[in-house]
Amino acid sequence: MLDLTPTIAGIRFPFCLMNAAGALSTSREELLALAHSESGAVVTKSITPESFLDPGACCGLENPGHEYYVELLPELRRASKPVIASVAGLTIAEVILVAQALAAAGADLIEINLNDPHVHTHLSPFSSAGRLGEIVSVICHKVSAPLAVKLPSTVPLSFPDIAAALLDAAIPVAICHNTPANGRLSQAEAILQASDGRLNVIGVGGVASGAEALAVLRRGIKAIQIGSAVVKEGVGVFARLKRELADSLESRESTKGPVGTR
């Protein structure tokens, strides 16, 4: 039986589906709506040291700056569900500064955004396995909260090299795309396989129904971040997905039938 309330990096989630960073998760009002929805966690917009407010300036990094979220975190935590703070920076020092502040403010898990193109340009995290390992190891040793690393959909490194770099740095969680990466496996499945199941993998993208969520979870993915469906439907999408996922599970179990009936 699938666990729809997984424990990831020692954190218990009341539901395995949550928003993706940036999906209605920038303002206080948006984040409180997520906190009081059926989402299994509150995932913030990617947070930088200072505000990025010009939509043309920094792609997906527009946000009010880390102090805004440091002040907001205690209020978000009252909803009694995990808060995942997504963090981005153009230097390792920037990432550490923001991650430390948000961890001290009570974030349960820090998501390191290595997905954004501007982060690639400045940090070059995937120029080599050694560079990736250096970045995540330095951050991990400086931040008290457990870390998750969010990968871009296309990575020039091999999946075994990525998995090894994360594991060597004691990173417990990888956030990977659910879309196919090598013609057969999704990136999420490939990283899970490359780590021999030692990484907790959260899949992101490609899920808009309970049946689609079930298909991903059955492959060993611990939880799923929802993006487009949240933007399209609002936070009420989680109540729908929870119902559909329960129905899909019930249907799957009923079609198995009692032992010996096949």
Which residue stretches match the model-derived regions?
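Glycine/Thr-rich beta-alpha phosphate-binding loop at enzyme active sites
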Residues: 55-63, 117-130, 157-197, 233, ...
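Active-site beta->alpha loop and helix N-cap motifs at the rims of alpha/beta catalytic domains
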Residues: 55-129
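Hydrophobic faces of well-ordered beta-strands that scaffold small-molecule active sites
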Residues: 15-21, 40-45, 83-87, 110-112, ...
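Catalytic cores of alpha/beta
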Residues: 29-34, 93-104, 155-169, 191-197, ...
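Alpha-helix-loop-beta-strand connector modules within alpha/beta enzyme cores
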Residues: 60-81, 127-149, 181-202, 241-254
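N-terminal capping/small domains of soluble enzymes
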Residues: 1-83, 89, 241
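Glycine-rich phosphate-binding active-site loops on the catalytic face of alpha/beta enzymes
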Residues: 44-49, 111-118, 173-182, 206-207, ...
